[in-house]
């Protein structure tokens, strides 16, 4: 079949695209509005003049003063959006990736594709474009089981949630824009440095409120104790199908015995269950062979782990060659 592909840098120029993907959608552009160091783009695949697939990516500049390609990275999250059934998805993805590589040539130093949820999806497209992979773990909770979320928790998790309840921990939703500055400063100050380094700037946070929370495509939950914020979570909501854990945090040192992170995650999962969502997706949770840390922590909420991959490519061939040899 003959396909034509086009790259778009502005939301206003896009054709009409159905809302079939949380990550590859027209409103995803709104997240990067007024962000000078981020450049969103979308590749749309057409068949007979009609869109059949799209792939969203964003370029991030890590240096505020230098604008050369060495300080730019490109990220893609999740499989592309497909707008028709029975499409040759792998073939279309191959064309999307080839177009992305041509578009990014000499523009970025590093490309990362993550949260695919399938270790073999796009394998040929990645290999032919000289990507290397690292095995990762995806964790997802089904909210359609006969056992509800509470009964999926481990015994220790149940005890921790009950203890937090007894001590007066509670959850509130962020519904006013005026609450955002204080909340953002709190997050940036208290979460782990490595996590904070990846946390987006405040304007992104503000854009999420206007584009997602106002339109019921997302929630910001804050966990409180004695009117003090001790944790929280940002979740993305897609068509009553999937709730995505985008970010979560908690003052686990100061309020260790109140289990703020555990209580927040439990509440968010319960919220998704009560509102008819089918899955709660933690996405890429850690390395496939990692037995402790984040993967073990999340698995105690009753989810299932699935093998997946993250794909990487450096624009400098010799670095890419060394990285490929090291990781594979």
Walk through the language-model features, giving the residues of each:
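A conserved beta-strand-loop-helix scaffold within acyl/acetyltransferase catalytic domains
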Residues: 2-65, 115-138, 146-254
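Aromatic (often tryptophan-rich) hydrophobic motifs at membrane interfaces
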Residues: 51, 82-87, 94-102, 208-317
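Conserved acyl-donor/pantetheine-binding loop and adjacent beta-alpha core of acyl/acetyltransferases
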Residues: 59-80
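Short, solvent-exposed loop/turn segments at the edges of secondary structure
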Residues: 73-78, 134-136, 293
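A gly/proline- and charged-residue-enriched helix-loop-helix capping module
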Residues: 74-116, 120
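Short secondary-structure transition/capping segments
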Residues: 124-125, 184-186, 292-295, 318-322
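Short His/Asp/Glu-rich catalytic/ion-coordination signatures at enzyme active sites or charged loops
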Residues: 142
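Membrane-proximal basic amphipathic "stem/tether" segments
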Residues: 312-328
């Amino acid at each position: 079949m003959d396909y034509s592909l086009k790259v778009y840098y502005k939301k206003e120029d896009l054709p009409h695209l159905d809302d079939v993907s949380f990550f590859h959608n027209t409103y995803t552009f709104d997240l990067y509005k007024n962000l000078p160091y981020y450049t969103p783009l979308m590749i749309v695949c057409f068949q007979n003049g009609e869109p059949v697939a799209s792939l969203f990516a964003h370029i991030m500049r890590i240096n505020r003063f230098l604008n050369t390609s060495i300080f730019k990275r490109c990220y893609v999250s999740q499989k592309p959006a497909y707008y028709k059934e029975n499409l040759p998805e792998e073939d279309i993805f191959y064309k999307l990736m080839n177009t992305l590589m041509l578009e990014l040539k000499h523009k970025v130093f590093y490309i990362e594709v993550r949260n695919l949820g399938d270790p073999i999806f796009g394998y040929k497209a990645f290999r032919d474009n000289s990507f290397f992979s690292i095995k990762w773990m995806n964790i997802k909770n089904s909210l359609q089981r006969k056992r509800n979320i509470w009964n999926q928790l481990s015994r220790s998790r149940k005890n921790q949630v009950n203890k937090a309840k007894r001590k007066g921990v509670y959850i509130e939703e962020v519904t006013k824009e005026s609450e955002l500055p204080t909340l953002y400063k709190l997050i940036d100050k208290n979460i782990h440095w490595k996590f904070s380094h990846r946390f987006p700037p405040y304007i992104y946070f503000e854009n999420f409120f206007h584009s997602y929370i106002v339109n019921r495509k997302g929630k910001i939950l804050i966990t409180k104790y004695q009117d003090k914020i001790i944790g929280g979570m940002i979740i993305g909501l897609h068509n009553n199908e999937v709730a995505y854990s985008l970010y979560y945090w908690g003052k686990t040192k100061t309020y260790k015995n109140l289990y703020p992170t555990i209580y927040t995650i439990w509440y968010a999962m319960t919220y998704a269950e009560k509102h008819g969502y089918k899955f709660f997706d933690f996405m890429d949770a850690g390395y496939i062979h990692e037995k402790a840390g984040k993967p073990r922590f999340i698995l105690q909420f009753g989810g299932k782990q699935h093998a997946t991959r993250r794909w990487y490519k450096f624009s400098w061939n010799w670095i890419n060659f060394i990285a490929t040899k090291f990781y594979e």
